[in-house]
Amino acid sequence: MYILEISLKFTPMPVSVQRKEAEAAQAAYQQVVEALRSGQPSVLELHCEFQAEKKLAVLTSEIASVQLYEKSGGSATVKRPGFAVIGE
């Protein structure tokens, strides 16, 4: 399972959709990146393959960042890429 996570400007919680296949996840990631590169505000619509009823529409001018990562199949938790604080 692959997670495409989109962070929006001035919004503390990201929005995300999931893809089952790596190729589909990469295609969705490229769709978001191309929308950002265009510089033209538009509505970007995505759907989730894990929860079929979950749909997402965002205004591309409000996207701050996008990341794609793989959810490990062995546990219910997801380790997101980036920095993590480890307690002693």
Curated annotation (Swiss-Prot):
The protein, known as: UPF0367 protein Synpcc7942_1638
Family: Belongs to the UPF0367 family.
Gene source species: Synechococcus elongatus (strain ATCC 33912 / PCC 7942 / FACHB-805) (Anacystis nidulans R2)
